[in-house]
């Protein structure tokens, strides 16, 4: 064979391969039919179907039809329940021993993404319980902790594939006994509740000063750009401070504030401080005394992420009652049931069901507490949390009634792909790339 023919022999397959890879991927359609579809936001469809197109929900109803073709996969639910994927808005899984940077009471520059262990089997265990999205938070050792990361439970996927795309940023604040205990045991500030809030207030004052410095710098650049005799390069930027930069984002509304808190009096103090500095509180986490101040929470559009009936495990939990979630909800508070546990996250459906027993929540109200409400707390309710057209196809097929101790997930889909199948328990490990 001549050199020229040999070269063509080698190049042509490469060109064909490149051309093939350049072609758009064939559309992928899934139709789940014969399901009891619990949408979370628009009631239940007794004999419903869901059409998924390229990972998004395309249609929901009693009868849906996808374009015919070999690319359509049919899943017969066999009359079983179909719900949105469960969302845990307070989790510490896959962070191992890196939950708390307890070297300073103010550490907003910490990023939980840097501690995220995407191979942690706890991700898969939660997935097996129907959890598809989690907010991984800094711990509660510090008055102002680090920045959270939002993940999808695509166990076996790459690290970047697990990160929830374009999720809003959140930061963890904490008040009460935990910061007191951590720093008080070292005989340093804070060691009291007044110390806690003094530390928080001082950090926010410093952030205000930092913002003013940067605002003045940017104003000078704008003035110099308008003045032909001046160069914008003449303006000297302030020194960057990652801690104050993060807190400035809080004050600008670019970082949602999630607060670990138990007592009613502390909630009122945090509300007052937020008004003092002009930022919004997204949610109070734990919030076991929310029932005492539910009117104030509703008036300020502050959600709670709470336990169903966990109480008495620490001093701050002595006034907890199992009716807390429903009492707050009846006052207009957006309520989520969260785990804060590698065990509870697999049973959040049962925890939500307890609100039906304690307080008389309806089926839809209970389901919202583990789907659309925590999605709102995380800031992703436009993408997940309900079975609606245009949302990510994060879905769970249950082998029994989901709001009971008898229903367990049979299949869990994330972005239209099956990541858990009870009949194929090793499915997730095959996704590793």
Predicted regions and their residues:
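Acidic, glycine-enriched loop/beta-strand segments at the rims
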Residues: 24, 37-49, 62-64, 361-368, ...
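Bacterial N-terminal signal peptides
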Residues: 7-18
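Divalent metal-coordination and catalytic microenvironments
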Residues: 35, 50, 55, 79, ...
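Active-site core of metal-dependent hydrolases
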Residues: 41, 47, 112-113, 137, ...
């Amino acid at each position: 064979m001549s050199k020229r023919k040999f070269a063509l022999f080698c190049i042509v397959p490469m060109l064909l391969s490149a051309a093939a890879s350049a072609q758009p991927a064939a559309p992928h359609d899934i139709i789940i039919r014969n399901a009891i579809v619990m949408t979370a936001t628009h009631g239940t469809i007794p004999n419903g179907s869901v059409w998924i197109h390229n990972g998004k929900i395309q249609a929901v109803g009693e009868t849906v039809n996808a374009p015919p073709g070999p690319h359509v996969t049919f899943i017969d639910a066999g009359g079983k329940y179909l719900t949105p994927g469960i969302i845990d808005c307070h989790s510490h899984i896959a962070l191992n021993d890196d939950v708390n940077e307890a070297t300073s009471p103010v550490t907003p520059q910490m990023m939980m993404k840097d501690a995220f262990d995407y191979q942690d089997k706890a991700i898969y265990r939660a997935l097996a319980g129907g959890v598809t999205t989690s907010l991984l938070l800094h711990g509660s050792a510090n008055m102002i902790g680090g920045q959270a990361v939002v993940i999808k439970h695509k166990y076996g996927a790459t690290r970047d594939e697990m990160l929830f795309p374009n999720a809003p940023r959140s930061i963890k604040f904490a008040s009460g006994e935990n910061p007191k205990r951590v720093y008080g045991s070292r005989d340093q500030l804070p060691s009291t509740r007044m110390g806690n809030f003094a530390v928080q207030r001082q950090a926010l004052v410093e952030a205000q000063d930092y913002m003013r410095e940067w605002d003045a710098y940017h104003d000078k650049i704008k003035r110099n750009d308008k003045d032909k005799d001046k160069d914008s390069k003449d303006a000297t930027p302030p020194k960057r401070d990652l801690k104050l930069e993060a807190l400035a984002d809080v004050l600008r509304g670019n970082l949602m504030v999630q607060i670990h808190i138990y007592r009613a009096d502390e909630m009122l103090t945090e509300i007052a401080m937020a008004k003092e500095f002009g930022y919004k509180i997204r949610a109070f986490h734990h919030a076991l005394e929310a029932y005492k101040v539910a009117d104030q929470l509703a008036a300020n559009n502050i959600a709670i992420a709470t336990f169903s009936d966990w109480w008495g495990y620490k001093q701050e939990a002595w006034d907890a009652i199992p009716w807390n979630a429903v009492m707050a909800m009846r006052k207009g508070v957006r309520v989520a049931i969260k785990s804060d546990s590698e065990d509870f996250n697999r049973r959040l459906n049962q925890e939500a069901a307890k609100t039906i027993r304690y307080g008389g929540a309806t089926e839809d109200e209970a389901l919202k507490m583990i789907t659309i409400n925590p999605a709102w707390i995380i800031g992703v309710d436009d993408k997940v949390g309900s079975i609606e057209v245009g949302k990510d196809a994060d879905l769970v097929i249950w082998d029994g009634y989901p709001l009971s101790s008898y229903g367990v997930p049979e299949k869990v889909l994330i972005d239209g792909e099956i990541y858990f199948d009870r009949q194929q328990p090793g499915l997730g490990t095959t996704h590793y790339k």
